[in-house]
Amino acid sequence: MRRPVPYHRVAAIMTILSLAGAGHQARLDARGGMLTGPTANLAPGHVQANLAILPQAVAGDFLRFCQRNPKPCPLLAVSEPGDPSLPELGLDIDIRTDVPRYRVWRDGKLVDEPLDVRGLWRDDLVAFLIGCSFSFEEAMLENGLPVRHIEQGCNVPMYRTNIATHPAGPFSGPLVVSMRPLKAADAIRAIQVTSRFPSVHGAPVHLGDPALIGIADLGRPDYGDAVEIRAGEIPVFWACGVTPQSVVAAVRPEFCITHAPGHMLVTDLLNSRLAAF
């Protein structure tokens, strides 16, 4: 006679299935045009990913670029040429439809921001999925650290810097950073918390004076939305997965598709699985 499965194991299995379902539902909502906005704090517990899609002819160089720049470009997955599925990241993923908003680039110029890219898909396209700081924000919130853009219901502010990335083939350009204002004591705690997640950018690359990294005005981000910086707070900057978009603008490949900043692929992976310690 088979012994019944203990309740705690059933509960654990149901929790895992429920969590996976939240990521899948977010993708279905994007696929159906019901999710078109930023994904910060969406499907809590789930890994979110930045996207860059390039022709196979330059994919090898871009792979090396990511390997040489793991802070802004921590790779989570790479697709096979022409294959829009990414089974290692989740059930039934179609990278052509499951991101809330895309950007289309031709010769380095942004030409469109569609909700799906099925009509642009080619057999030679390779998708790169890159870790996103939205994943470590869950850990920040759990540790009582404020995340201002979530509080204000807007997109995270992102800025191009004067910090150069390490080139690979034709790919080179400035590092892009995301910014979250924190009190000094909270900034120290944020360093400790985010250091546990190197596959989603890890610890900050700079805190304090933005001019030292080439940012002239925090009120005018290059991507995303400006947020309030309150008395006693300092800006804290993390390497950002939008860096490939600044590189695309500089390198001007003949064709490229990216996510719109802040509009991520929500995966079935759990943030807890990415913690290094």
From Swiss-Prot:
Keywords: Lyase. The keyword ATP-binding does not apply. SUPFAM superfamilies: PSTPO5379-like (SSF160920). It is an enzyme of class 4 (lyase). InterPro entries: D-Glu_cyclase, Putative_hydro-lyase, UPF0317. One of its GO terms (molecular function) is lyase activity. Its EC number is 4.2.1.-. Belongs to the D-glutamate cyclase family. This is Putative hydro-lyase BPP3031.
